[in-house]
């Protein structure tokens, strides 16, 4: 079993790196504002038709464009969901959503979280899924990538005050990165058996003679960008464990690759744009080390079996509860770590049914800020915050002003870095405390004791860090939970983007200093270890007390 697990991890990472390397080169061209071959004429026509100016923006203008687009998208999606019953492509005549569920869903998809307090096949029409959720899957992913484009330019430009043009970046990312890759993935899913139609739900007779209503819909097109954009919201309630979304082991492997593809490519792109590919490889090494360790822990925990079933005398040599038999324990464990290391949240197994330690690792990966590969764009700019913190700590130890890529990291950057890093832990801990203090929060818990608290902590961690997966034992479709999680998702997304853009605005105006004998190398194994230690230290100090009350207490009980 151990050999199979290591082979699975190694194969996954090898294929991932092979695919991400050329995509990283294409992204590097876009960061450097070099159009991809053959796209200049199309861009010129589109910019002219849309009235888009390619004039560069400072950080405030760039941020305003990103915020404006997302707030407008939130409003449009909110009213679309409220009035769903008036719109076309609703063969099941599904009613509009309640205001609190519509708000939660709109915020969820605009912030790239895709938390779902509803069942897709019984709640949303085809129009809402396509024109509402799928559109936001593209736009939220493009927004995250645009932010990291701006931050990378801030590190590599000198003595400037502009970071590019947000509208140009968003258009190029959507047209030349997300759309073509998502199209290829969608066609592969269709070939493998995923649904793509507009038929009414089909009544069929099962082999047992019973009647069953099978949901239909344009699944493959949404599934592709759901994974590629690290969105994660399923067309169906069962998400990627549903055979209409994820029909074969091949589609399952491609889905995992799609989740990590752009985050990995962005690391390669960062190294190219910085003029030192070792910088990108350093980030990949740090992410990969944490990732492999976490996968190993989850696999080990799940193959030990369920101790509660063993105590009852039941056969539980491995923990298959809540897992698809066609995927098994090892693949389910790998997928769980992939989807929570990235801010995806798609699932092929019920995380609520994992063992105490097996469920704690995905929760902790979210709590450290989704920086182990992370979401498209958001994972890398989150990790860059820890890079700045690690450089600052190293500077304190050797008594020098911290530098990164030749740019001095001053008090302003460190204050903004600390603010950005503290946003999501504050939301998680305060949100979980509020839920446990109120009847409205506690009434949603299916289980008592440590596992019930773990359900609450997981939900708030998932929302604040824009992941979207859940311990499904929490009944979250209530005004209290819909509003609390919507607030966590919105602040968790834009409360980090705002200081990140402010950091970019500060760094882009600085001039790079040549390296000296006292400059800390940021591309070697020493800095990789320092960076990993910084991530672990912040995660440990912040969340160990809360984790001790939940999964650790459950494991020891």
From Swiss-Prot:
The record's GO molecular-function terms, alphabetically, read:
P-type potassium transmembrane transporter activity; potassium ion binding
Q: Which GO terms describe its cellular component?
A: plasma membrane
The places in or outside the cell where this protein is found are: Cell inner membrane
Q: Does the keyword Protease apply?
A: no
What are the protein's UniProt keywords? Cell inner membrane, Cell membrane, Ion transport, Membrane, Potassium, Potassium transport, Transmembrane, Transmembrane helix, Transport
State the NCBIfam families in the record. kdpA
Q: Which family does the entry's similarity section mention?
A: Belongs to the KdpA family.
**HAMAP family linked to this entry:** KdpA (MF_00275)
Annotated protein name in UniProt = Potassium-transporting ATPase potassium-binding subunit
Q: Say which species the protein is native to.
A: Escherichia coli O6:K15:H31 (strain 536 / UPEC)
Lineage of this protein's species? Answer: Bacteria, Pseudomonadati, Pseudomonadota, Gammaproteobacteria, Enterobacterales
